[in-house]
Amino acid sequence: MLESHPAEAATPLLDALQAELADRARLGLLRQRRVLHGMQGVYVEIEGKRLLSFCSNDYLGLASHPSLISAMRDCAVTTGAGTGASHLVSGHQQAHEALEHALQTFMGLPGVLLFTTGYMANLGIITALCGRQDAIFADKLNHASLNDAALLSRAELKRYAHNDLTGLERLLAQSQARRKLVVADAVFSMDGDLAPVPALLSLCERYDAYLMLDDAHGFGVLGAHGRGVLEHFGLDSPRIIYMATLGKAAGAAGAFVAGPTILTEYLMQTARPYIYTTASPAPVAAAAMAGVQLIEHDHARRAHLRALIADFRASCRLQRWQLMASETAIQPVVIGSNEEAVQVSKRLLEHGVLVPAIRPPTVPRGTARLRISLSAAHTHEDVQRLLDILHRLEEA
């Protein structure tokens, strides 16, 4: 430890930061990391304990799939560990190109552009498309990256109440902006519900706006073939700008934007988070390719996940705590206070089950919750074990 290091000497800035951290601790908002040993999966090892995990967004159980591991290993042998340059210099390798083409075919969309992360993709898309003369209309429960991107773009930001189509239409009707962009999570990451995408698209068509969808939690899971929210609703429109990630259902890392080729070409030329960063390692792209292939062909995983979701909701008998309305793999249980949510999470941990307590500012004040993430790698027995413990804790 380096507590005596000169960098640890007190300064006004460090004193102020320490005071803010103390306030967070007092309010039950201080976050901590846990070190996971071994692979991500249904069972994980933390501090020597084997825990049943309902934490990860590995919705199809592909993060530790042998096909992804083999693809990553084989690619690393021929490409090395890192790319050493941005995509537009010399970092765009054959694995990246192959993945973009595979995603074009899989999604049935002509243009695809890879990004390092979903956060970077959202920053890149919104700041490239919107500026001071434009307006962004954002759901109040959107992911932080969408909010940050809107602020960074310097466009006029109008936020509407969650899934409030009437409020959104009023804002669109009043706007005189040069370009109007409606932005929404396709699946809301902390509530698990879906955006009313067909109705959003209808409003965009009526008011000459465009619709950007962050389908991080729908890609690979929704739709008969896992093509996400667009397949789920049967939508195809040049007004839709589609973003999805490769680090959740696909089991690897990264993200992509899909839509018209003019859109992706424009983003390649202008999106600063794409231009000014080192390309992600080619082995990661190879693993993502293997994940996309499994999404396309292994329908049994999605079917099993849907059965687990139905089983969980049918068997949940919570009364004091609120199971939110969600038909996705994200099943939030609202506890209310920060302190009680953290305490319930700790009690679950004592019973060998890992479920995160989600608190403000990630969720609205007074709605601290357990965010239960189901995976196709879980069994019905795993789900029943979780529910049995939750029911006992609520009654205690």
Curated annotation (Swiss-Prot):
Modified residues (N6-(pyridoxal phosphate)lysine): K248
Molecular functions (GO terms): 8-amino-7-oxononanoate synthase activity; pyridoxal phosphate binding
Pfam families: Aminotran_1_2
Keywords assigned: Biotin biosynthesis, Pyridoxal phosphate, Transferase
Annotated residues for binding of substrate: R31, H143, T362
Cross-referenced InterPro entries: Aminotransferase_I/II_large (IPR004839), AON_synthase_class-II (IPR050087), AONS_Archaea/Proteobacteria (IPR004723), AONS_Proteobacteria (IPR022834), PyrdxlP-dep_Trfase (IPR015424), PyrdxlP-dep_Trfase_major (IPR015421), PyrdxlP-dep_Trfase_small (IPR015422)
Residues involved in pyridoxal 5'-phosphate binding: G118, Y119, S189, H217, T245
GO biological process assignments: biotin biosynthetic process
Catalytic activity: 6-carboxyhexanoyl-[ACP] + L-alanine + H(+) = (8S)-8-amino-7-oxononanoate + holo-[ACP] + CO2
Keyword Transferase in annotation: yes
The protein's Enzyme Commission number: 2.3.1.47
Pathway: Cofactor biosynthesis; biotin biosynthesis
Cofactor: pyridoxal 5'-phosphate
Membership in a protein family: Belongs to the class-II pyridoxal-phosphate-dependent aminotransferase family. BioF subfamily.
Subunit details: Homodimer.
Function of the molecule: Catalyzes the decarboxylative condensation of pimeloyl-[acyl-carrier protein] and L-alanine to produce 8-amino-7-oxononanoate (AON), [acyl-carrier protein], and carbon dioxide.
Record's protein name: 8-amino-7-oxononanoate synthase
Organism listed in the record: Methylobacillus flagellatus (strain ATCC 51484 / DSM 6875 / VKM B-1610 / KT)
